[in-house]
Amino acid sequence: EALHLNEDEFQPDKEDMAANELGTMLHDVLEQFCRLHPSLEDGMTTASLQREIGEILDETFTRQYGSRPLMPLLLQKRSMEQRLNVYAEQHLEDLRNGWTCIAFEQSVENWRLGDFSLRFRIDRIDRHADGSLRVIDYKTGKTDSCEKKHLGTMKRPDALPLLSPALHPYTRRQKNGKAVHFRWKDLQLPLYVLWAMEEYCGRPTAAYYALPANPLDIGISAWDTLHDPQPGCDICALESARSWILELMRLIREGRGLITAEELGWDTPSYDVFKDLVSSSHETLQDLLGLNITPHLPF
């Protein structure tokens, strides 16, 4: 009670952290650290920042796991220390290069896109001395580039109207003239950028900040081409993403779009929220959800 902790927060007998718990702790430490050091100050050194971020980790870790944690937890803490030391060094370099952190764990409530009200949280937003902005999402494991994580090639672009006639592939033309069609398999960063455009104006870029266990893989992976039409494209990637966001939300609201990845020629998802609930028959799934399927879907 004196520490204002509930029993779920203080876990001195816990053996180790799950991946999501480790990620949450890293997020908490980074938020506290960036609030203390959002911009360049006189006397900043790599050593001083590493010392401070280490102290924040010590306090956060002890508050949750006590002063005598088990060995697996100590090893995980050591892994976090290594990652945060690299982060502190890179943070100072970013500040010296003109970047300033202007928002941390930014909560967005009731933002309207089209007819929809959305809410989400953005890990970090930076502004450069030249006025440019970047929206950052932390990744505590090794991750693909922003573009590879968000876009997947389509083997059967002609099947996309089965999901919705309003959805169109994002198409780019290679140097040899061959058109390559992509679908949006993730829309997180484009959504954040669309909000930031309204909130701050300008043309914000997006980035992942990867913090995996291997220190050599820690760093920012920027997505600088969201706003720029690529050769052979009618629209830029961001406008394509906007149209997909709006149409997919309509599909969900109207109960449309119950079609499998296989029928669209897409890779099978690594998880399926329905697999333990119903059989694979469309009829059973429709009955479970009480949805009316629109005529253009093939069942």
Where are these regions (language model features)?
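RecB-family 4Fe-4S metal-dependent nuclease core
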Residues: 1-299
